[in-house]
Amino acid sequence: SLRFNSMRVYLHDLLWEMKDEFLINFEKFLSICEENEIKPIIVLFDDCHRANPKLGTQYLPVKGIHNSGWSQSPGHKIVKDINRGCLSELKRLKNFSPGILDLYRNDLRILLWDLYNEPGQFGIGEQSLDFLELVWDWAFEVRPDQPLTSCMDGSIGEKIIALNSEKSDVITFHTYEANKLEPTIKKLSNFDRPMICTEYMAREFGTTFEFSLPIFKKHNVGCYNWGFVAGKSQTHFGWETILKLKESVENKDFVTDIKEIPEPKIWFHDIYRMDG
């Protein structure tokens, strides 16, 4: 047993269009967590990976490509539209974000709300600032009992990072490079707030468990490694494989049998194979 007592899980705004079914599944998930003494961090929005999310049948995994099916929420197109003053999606998004926060505002099964993962990533930069400001405003209208956060290191743009540092109840950050881990902790400790590293552990960059865990313990910092089981998300492959995504899709190099998922010589993220 790894003795994990928490996990970080992403929701998606589009699922609010199937609210009743979504909430049934979310309740099942929270019940399973509670039975296993796990309190999750819940992530609402995300600027990373595929830019055009949709309901229905999802992309097949692309063989050997890191996170080939991961979809942004709400997606860069909508975020850019909001930045330009086109607000046609705001009502729908506001139904989702304050809606889920309000329903679970007093729920002791949830540890923390991570409102927006890595705003500014994947080339959008500070065009995400306007939407991020709205997300923070909506969250403070509800003001759930659980702490609120959005990461600092991991986000892109000075104004975005400044906003997250001002608003976050808990300082969260993402560090995958071994030489940056302890300096980042020392820098962020100046905020004098509880601190959690919500993403780390890239073997290729040196942030192995053996290297990282003593540092987190030394500074009393909570930590969440990326990845658990090497499955269809294939995050045991490195980020550089994302550059091959378009070519691999054109060649239809999809995983149609989950048993066909390949393995790199050295895993990037993840801990277990699918058979445990």
Language-model-detected regions and their locations in the chain:
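Active-site mouth of glycoside hydrolases
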Residues: 1-170, 174-175, 179-182, 191, ...
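Substrate-binding cleft of secreted/luminal carbohydrate-active enzymes
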Residues: 194-276
